[in-house]
Every structure is written in structure tokens, then in C-alpha cells.
């Protein structure tokens, strides 16, 4: 992607008009700012929308939520948003986690259990794109299916709450490109892609590379894939640091970056690489406050969970809804940590994974 293409991308993404979604009930709740996409289930075109949350449901609908895992605070915060919103609306919520992106069969069994419950709607944070899509197309069920965070095929999808992971990476790339414009001192980056999803596709990595177009970042070293397990990520980090002592930046997920903070402290390098996380967590919040991390993206995980519950209940209640939405992606630095962003992104410190809500 050349410089003109990058500029076009920014105008296309961010020079947008605002639309208002009006619901037929009054509420004192704060409106949510989202990106509403048309055509549906594509990330290329969106408009900013204001959604006023519904405040109650006409009956205790049964909602079943499936997560890839709750190994880090990203999905924990999504879980909190769902749990809190379900409690506010007086609906039932049953949740389950697959235990990692390699557990396709386990998630498929959990989906079948949702149908056997029986759920009125399924909110699916998938472990795989292609493999699960092919199975879902063969599924004989009229239960509405809503995608959450991770992408799903539009076929058979009633609604979706999520953001473009390509754009999460692109924002990292542009952040680095602005620090190192073409013609300035070259920079070297190590990129840790995290878990290898079954479709073996890294939208984040593609976004980073496109965002770095026409910059002085001359080398991007890609580390190996690895599950969001601290021991796995630590081994990958140590291996790469042993091989490359001249890094300017380390970019990865929140788990990797948290480990890197301690690893770099232990190594006492003369010029340690600076750290960037393409997504957010409680650890990233603390690290930004202390100046240990340069930048982290938040796609507002708590709001993800709230929107998913709100969207499903709207559909079941026959109320107006936007079928394909997502929170705004916000790039956070030490001087951009507002209480509202924290509230919309991170679960309370005392919150534990919750798998059942009864009205």
C-alpha cells in the first residue's frame, strides 16, 4: 500500500457521517457510540451511530454465549459486559469457553448444548472461521446466531458485534510510521502473532505491514505462533531476544507484552525495545500508567459484551436494531487514559468469570 492509498484509507474509514438509531422507549442510560456497517458483515464501509440501550426485556430470554477462552482479561472483560447487561435486562445467560483456539470440537459440542438447552439466541465468539462456518451451514436450526468479536461468514448470521482486526493492526502500523516517517532513522520491529487460529490467517499482521507503508521501519521479524499461555509466550520471546539484540520495538498481544516487561527488566539491555500491544488488558492499563508500554489499542471489550446482549434482545423483542456493529478502536497512550474508556474496556478488578445469569 503506497502513501496515497494509506491517505485514502484514512479518509474512507474516518471521514464519515453520523446516524442515529432511535428506539421506541425512553431511557436514562448513556448512548453507545458504535460503527454501523453497510453492506452487512463487511468491514470496508461504516457510519458512526448512537445506540440508546434498551432497559428491560419483556421476558427472561435464554441467551447462550460461547467464547474461545478466558485465559486473559480481554475475554474476561467481554464476559463482564455480557453478564452485567443480562442482569440489567433480566434475561438468562449461559456461557462456556472452549479453552483455546485449537478446540474446535469442544466449541462445536458447546454449541450443540446451547441448542439442547434450548437457547433463544446464540452469541458466538468462534475459535475458527472456515471450519466452523462449513458446519454452521449444515446446521438445521432456526435459533438466531450472533457473531461476537471474531469473524464469521454472513451465511446464516443474524447479527454481529465486532471490529476489524486488520484495522487493529493497521493502527499499530500507522502509529509506528508516524514515529518513523520515510527518510528518518530506520527501525526494526518484532511482531508476535499470538495463537494460530485454525484458518491460519493473521489479519492483524497484514494490517501492521500495510500501516507501515512508506515508513522507515525497514524490517519486521515475525515470531512463531503460540497460544495465550504465559509459558508458551515467554519461550517465544526469549528465543527471539536471544537471536535479535537490535530491536527497536516489540509488538504483540497483551499477554506477550506483559511478559516482555519483566523479561526486558531481567536482561538489562543498554537500549531495550519499546513495547506495543495491538489489544488491551488490565495489565496494559497499568503498564501505560507506569510508562512501561508505549501504546495499546482498545476495541472496548466491555462494550462489546453489552452490545452483543442488547443486539440479541432487540432482535428477540422485534425492536429496531443495527445488524452489524462494533465499538470504535481507540489507540491509547499514557496521556489518553480516560475513566470512560477504562469503564467501557476493562472488567472490575474483583470480577471473576461468570457462566450463568438467572433473572
Residue ranges and their predicted role:
Residues 160-187, 233-234, 280-284, 299-317:
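Hydrophobic alpha-helical segments within soluble ligand-binding/sensing domains
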Residues 32-59, 303-359:
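Hinge/cleft segment of the Venus flytrap/periplasmic-binding protein
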Residues 74-91, 168-172, 199-218, 236, ...:
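Short, solvent-exposed amphipathic alpha-helices that sit
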Residues 63, 82, 172-216, 221-223, ...:
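An alpha-beta-alpha
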Residues 121-140, 208, 226-286:
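Hydrophobic alpha-helical
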Residues 87-103, 188-191, 211-230:
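Short beta-strand elements in bilobed, periplasmic/extracellular small-molecule ligand-binding domains
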Amino acid at each position: 500500500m503506497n502513501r496515497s492509498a494509506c491517505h485514502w484509507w484514512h479518509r474512507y474509514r474516518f471521514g464519515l457521517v453520523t446516524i442515529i438509531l432511535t428506539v421506541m422507549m425512553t431511557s436514562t442510560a448513556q448512548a453507545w457510540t458504535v460503527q454501523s456497517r453497510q453492506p452487512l458483515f463487511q468491514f470496508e464501509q461504516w457510519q458512526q451511530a448512537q445506540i440508546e440501550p434498551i432497559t428491560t426485556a419483556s421476558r427472561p430470554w435464554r441467551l447462550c454465549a460461547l467464547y474461545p477462552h478466558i485465559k486473559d482479561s480481554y475475554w474476561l472483560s467481554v464476559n463482564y459486559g455480557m453478564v452485567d447487561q443480562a442482569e440489567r435486562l433480566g434475561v438468562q445467560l449461559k456461557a462456556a469457553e472452549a479453552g483455546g483456539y485449537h478446540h474446535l470440537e469442544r466449541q462445536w459440542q458447546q454449541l450443540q448444548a446451547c441448542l439442547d438447552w434450548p437457547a433463544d439466541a446464540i452469541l458466538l465468539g468462534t475459535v475458527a472461521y472456515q471450519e466452523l462456518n462449513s458446519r454452521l451451514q449444515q446446521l438445521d436450526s432456526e435459533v438466531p446466531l450472533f457473531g461476537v468479536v471474531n469473524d464469521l461468514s454472513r451465511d446464516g448470521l443474524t447479527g454481529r458485534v465486532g471490529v476489524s482486526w486488520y484495522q487493529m493492526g493497521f493502527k499499530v502500523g500507522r502509529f509506528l510510521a508516524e514515529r518513523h516517517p520515510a527518510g528518518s532513522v530506520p527501525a526494526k520491529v518484532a511482531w508476535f502473532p499470538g495463537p494460530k487460529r485454525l484458518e491460519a490467517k493473521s489479519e492483524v499482521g497484514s494490517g501492521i505491514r500495510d500501516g507501515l507503508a512508506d515508513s522507515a521501519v525497514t524490517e519486521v521479524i515475525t515470531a512463531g505462533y503460540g497460544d495465550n499461555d504465559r509459558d508458551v509466550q515467554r519461550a517465544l520471546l526469549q528465543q527471539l531476544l536471544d537471536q535479535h539484540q537490535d530491536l527497536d520495538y516489540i509488538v504483540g498481544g497483551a499477554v506477550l507484552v506483559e511478559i516482555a516487561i519483566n523479561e526486558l527488566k531481567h536482561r538489562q539491555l543498554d537500549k531495550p525495545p519499546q513495547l506495543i500491544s495491538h489489544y488491551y488488558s488490565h495489565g496494559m492499563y497499568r503498564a501505560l500508567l507506569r510508562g512501561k508500554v508505549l501504546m495499546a489499542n482498545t476495541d472496548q471489550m466491555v462494550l462489546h459484551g453489552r452490545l452483543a446482549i442488547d443486539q440479541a434482545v432487540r432482535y428477540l423483542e422485534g425492536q429496531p436494531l443495527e445488524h452489524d456493529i462494533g465499538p470504535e478502536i481507540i489507540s491509547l497512550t499514557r496521556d489518553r487514559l480516560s475513566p470512560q474508556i477504562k469503564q467501557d474496556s476493562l472488567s472490575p478488578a474483583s470480577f471473576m468469570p461468570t457462566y450463568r445469569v438467572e433473572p
